[in-house]
């Protein structure tokens, strides 16, 4: 089984931060017996991310995406995955509850952008995030598992 890592973020692409996520994920993939053949970094651009994702879907069984899940307007990973896979985004009620709780215990008022993190592609399995507000997802296609 082949795997590929796509890291999303202009700050990584420009070298403003070191891409430690790719190294961590590659090590975990190897430990799980998955062959990681490709690693790609793409900036916060939906069109370029879609192109990279389509290419990955042609050549890899498992695709891990890291980044682009935040509450800002340039965080477009889930939206792009949904579009490429022909899925609509829908609200995950459990994620909405977790986001509300995250902010309530900190006595912070969430913004409208925070709620977009509860949107997930239809049919995706939602992964709770105990360290922040953006849940992960697993989306299965006929050929791929996208995480």
PLM region spans:
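Glycine-rich phosphate/diphosphate-binding loop of Rossmann-like nucleotide-binding domains
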Residues: 1-39
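Short glycine-rich anion-binding loops that position phosphate/pyrophosphate groups of nucleotides
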Residues: 11, 68-71
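Short beta->alpha junction loops
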Residues: 38-48
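An anion/phosphate-binding loop that grips the pyrophosphate of nucleotide cofactors and donors
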Residues: 60
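Proline/glycine-rich low-complexity loops and linkers
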Residues: 75-147
């Amino acid at each position: 089984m082949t795997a590929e890592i796509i890291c999303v973020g202009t700050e990584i692409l420009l070298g403003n931060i070191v891409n430690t996520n790719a190294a961590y994920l590659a090590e975990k993939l190897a430990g799980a017996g998955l062959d990681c053949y490709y690693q790609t970094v793409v900036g916060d651009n939906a069109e370029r991310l879609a192109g990279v994702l389509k290419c990955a879907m042609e050549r890899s069984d498992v695709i891990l995406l890291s980044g682009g899940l935040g509450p800002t307007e340039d965080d477009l990973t889930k939206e792009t995955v949904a579009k490429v896979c022909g899925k609509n985004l829908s609200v995950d009620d459990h994620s909405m509850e977790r986001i509300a709780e995250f902010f309530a215990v900190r006595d912070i008022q969430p913004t409208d952008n925070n709620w977009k993190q509860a949107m997930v592609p239809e049919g995706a399995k939602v992964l709770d995030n105990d360290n922040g507000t953006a849940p992960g997802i697993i989306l299965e296609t006929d050929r791929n598992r996208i995480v």
